[in-house]
């Protein structure tokens, strides 16, 4: 009896231990998902010391965080700093519908220079998504949902497998692009399946595996996040704010003894009809550039023109302005001549 009680007590204690570890579903520990909260608003991030292969630690400091909620997902955008410089960590946290569903997390890490390119790419995808929405509304108006579903299933092609746990259904690719920097590639794919449209951002290594890279951790595995298309604008706006607030500081730290930064001209803006155009001069490790933004809420499109291309841009603007002015004047003169001829004919008839 005493042996049975000891055996039963040991089993009960073990059960309590296992139950404490498996909060949220089997194989997922709440303490692993929310290790040591750095602040109450973003409790899912670990401490700033990251282990490396040699057994030491690389101090990583968190500078800023933003959170974007889209449908059943939360996206955390954190600007961090290591001994190599500043970088952006994007974490996607997905919570299932039921209590028994696991909380899944995926992440993406990229330098601030790549984040700036990602911001520009997002502008293109947002514009394309808006165009698809208008086009789809015109095409599907008057058709039943069943007809639309059959048509989409007929024209959709299965996609190659992606990261584990994505649970993606067969889908079609609506737009694709990529960013290549150093030995990494970032693929952006706007896709559609029976759940809706989404943007998948995937990072791959072009050479080498298992390296400790710029971000202070192993880069041997691909990283992927999936962003619902409806939230691309909000996600892009949060990204823009972080880049504007912390991108320039990263640039200054990378200059490493260069001369004092140049005093750049102040930005300007003007309004035309329902749009506003912004002109902002900036600089990074690649040189000086002019950022031209066209804003029509809730949309914002931006192009970046390097300093060496300003002269050619200016020449082309002046050229087309002069040509268009000549065309308009010629058209106006033709209309005036037509009116004069019509008036003379009327006088002859009188």
Swiss-Prot record:
Coiled coil: none annotated. It holds the Pfam family PurA. It comes from the Eukaryota. Residues 1-59, 136-172 are annotated as: Disordered. GO terms for cellular component: nucleus; synapse. Its main location: nucleus. Residues 137-149 have a biased composition (Basic and acidic residues). Keywords: DNA-binding, Nucleus, Phosphoprotein. Residues 54-296 bind DNA. It is found in: Nucleus. GO terms for molecular function: purine-rich negative regulatory element binding; RNA polymerase II transcription regulatory region sequence-specific DNA binding. Disulfide bonds: none annotated. The modification Phosphoserine is found at residues 163, 166, 342. Residues 47-59 have a biased composition (Polar residues). Isoform 1 is expressed in testis. Isoform 2 is expressed in blastocyst and kidney. Residues 9-27 have a biased composition (Gly residues). The keyword GTP-binding does not apply. InterPro entries: PUR-bd_fam (IPR006628). The keyword DNA-binding applies. Belongs to the PUR DNA-binding protein family. This is Purine-rich element-binding protein gamma. It comes from Mus musculus. The lineage of its organism: Eukaryota, Metazoa, Chordata, Craniata, Vertebrata.
């Amino acid at each position: 009896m005493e042996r049975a009680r000891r055996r039963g007590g040991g089993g009960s204690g073990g059960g309590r231990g296992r139950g404490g570890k498996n909060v949220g579903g089997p194989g997922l520990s709440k303490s692993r998902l929310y290790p040591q909260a750095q602040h109450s608003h973003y409790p899912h991030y670990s401490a700033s010391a990251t282990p490396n292969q040699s057994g030491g630690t690389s101090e990583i400091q968190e500078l800023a965080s933003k959170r974007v909620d889209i449908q059943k997902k939360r996206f955390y955008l954190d600007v961090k700093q290591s001994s190599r410089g500043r970088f952006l960590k994007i974490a996607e946290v997905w919570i299932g519908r039921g209590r028994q569903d696991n909380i899944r997390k995926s992440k993406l890490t990229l330098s601030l220079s790549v984040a700036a390119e990602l911001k520009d790419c997002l502008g293109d995808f947002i514009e394309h998504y808006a165009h698809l929405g208008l086009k789809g509304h015109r095409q599907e108006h008057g058709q039943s949902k069943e007809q639309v579903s059959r048509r989409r299933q007929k024209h959709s092609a299965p996609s190659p497998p992606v990261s584990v746990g994505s649970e993606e259904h067969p889908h079609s690719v609506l737009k694709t692009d990529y960013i290549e920097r150093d030995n990494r590639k970032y693929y952006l794919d706007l896709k559609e399946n029976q759940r809706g449209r989404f943007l998948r951002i995937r990072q791959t290594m072009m050479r080498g595996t298992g390296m400790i890279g710029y971000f202070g951790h192993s880069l041997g595995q691909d990283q992927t996040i999936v962003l619902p298309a409806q939230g691309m604008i909000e996600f892009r706006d949060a990204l823009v704010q972080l880049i504007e607030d912390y991108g320039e500081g990263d640039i200054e730290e990378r200059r490493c003894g260069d001369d004092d930064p140049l005093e750049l001209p102040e930005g300007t803006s003007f309004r035309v009809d329902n749009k506003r155009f912004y002109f902002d001069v900036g600089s990074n490790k690649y040189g000086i550039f002019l950022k031209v933004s066209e804003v029509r809420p809730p949309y914002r499109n931006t192009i970046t023109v390097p300093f060496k291309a300003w002269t050619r841009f200016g020449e082309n603007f002046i050229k087309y302005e002069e040509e268009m002015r000549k065309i308009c004047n010629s058209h106006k003169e033709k209309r005036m001549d037509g009116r004069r001829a019509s008036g003379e004919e009327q006088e002859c008839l009188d």
